[in-house]
Amino acid sequence: MCGALMERYVAAMVLSAAGDALGYFNGKWEFLQNGEKIHRQLAQLGGLDAIDVERWRVSDDTVMHLATAEALLEAGKVSDLTHLYSLLAKHYQDCMGDMDGRAPGGASVQNAMLLEPDKADGWRIPFNSHEGGCGAAMRAMCIGLRFPHSSQLDSLIQVSIESGRMTHHHPTGYLGALVSALFTAYAVNGKPPQQWGRGLMEVLPEAKKYIVQSGFFVEQNLQHWSYFQDQWEKYLKLRGIWDGKSAPTFPKPFDVKERDQFYSSVSYSGWGGSSGHDAPMIAYDAILAAGDSWKELAHRAFFHGGDSDSTAAIAGCWWGVMYGFKGVSPSNYEKLEYRNRLEETARALYSLR
């Protein structure tokens, strides 16, 4: 099992980046807000299995996910989380030098440059009511690879929140990072996906408790807390998985057009997956429906009219943890940009866990 789990760690990092590259298509598909057009173009390319990602660059999502992973590795088994936070801030700032042609989000760019990693608490930024975007969620999955054990839940909560609010200091933003990390840990532990949402609902009070204990912009955070929780509660009830036991139910038909409409309906501003609540939600919806099919996952999470590279990066990671490279066309990842770096960080995270 150990060797198999290491392989799944590798798949998690690599397929997250592969999903990102596929959903991004050098910017063409991230910003094409019509899923049916994307699926037509995909068919013209010969379908998913025919795509060779050699010239398909990864976006800001993977660059920042690698920054998170490499900061976790540099910190090692350190128990002082403030040291880790300074390293995260440094890596987030440094990775901004690798954003040419990768369409980085505004909040990530602006706030990364405000960070002062060498100063005490220089990794903190003020609360901002406009920072509910998905930039925190898209880079946090590997935190669940580093802290997968139930005994490490407090660390997972704290690190995902603080990594998130270095650039997205708003609950809708940084709680997205918590979901990305938490569901990765669930996947490592073989928890059935229909139980994940219920697990999140049980963890959110712990997250709120941490926000209060941290004593940093507590009032503002609590004032804006309910949107994220309400949206997830509504979604879990819609899919019939509020109890954490039932199988999810999907409407019929639920094809490309219907999915675009649904993704837009759960979004904050109409662009599905562009916020911290709905990027992991759309990824989760795809995981619930796709089972062990990489192609079905891609059709739902990578190729749609919303913020497709972010939902793809998150979904690709969770799916990779569960299924490894099962049924994935090698052309989708063999010549992937940064593949060696992704594999090295995955193996090192496995050793560190």
UniProtKB/Swiss-Prot annotation:
Domain of life (superkingdom): Eukaryota
Protein name per the record: ADP-ribosylhydrolase ARH1
- The disulfide bonds in this chain are none
What protein family does this chain belong to? Answer: Belongs to the ADP-ribosylglycohydrolase family.
Where on this chain does substrate bind?
K90, S129, G135
What is known about its subunit structure? Monomer.
Name the reaction it catalyses.
N(omega)-(ADP-D-ribosyl)-L-arginyl-[protein] + H2O = ADP-D-ribose + L-arginyl-[protein]; alpha-NAD(+) + H2O = ADP-D-ribose + nicotinamide + H(+)
Q: Where is this region: Substrate?
A: 106-108, 168-170, 268-270, 274-275
UniProt source species = Bos taurus (Bovine)
Question: What are its E.C. numbers?
Answer: 3.2.2.19
- Residues annotated for Mg(2+) 1 binding in this entry: S59, D60, D61, D309
Identify the coding gene. Answer: ADPRH
| GO terms for MF | ADP-ribosylarginine hydrolase activity; magnesium ion binding; potassium ion binding
Q: What does this protein do?
A: Specifically acts as an arginine mono-ADP-ribosylhydrolase by mediating the removal of mono-ADP-ribose attached to arginine residues on proteins.
- Name any cofactors this protein relies on: Mg(2+)
Q: Which UniProt keywords apply?
A: Hydrolase, Magnesium, Metal-binding
What are the binding positions for Mg(2+) 2 in this chain?
D307, D309, S310
Q: Which InterPro entries match?
A: ADP-ribosylarg_hydro, ADP-ribosylglycohydrolase, Ribosyl_crysJ1, Ribosyl_crysJ1_sf
For the protein in the UniProt heading, the enzyme class is hydrolase
Instruction: Please give the Gene3D superfamilies that the UniProt record associates with this protein.
Output: ADP-ribosylation/Crystallin J1 (1.10.4080.10)
Keyword Transmembrane in the entry? The reply is: no
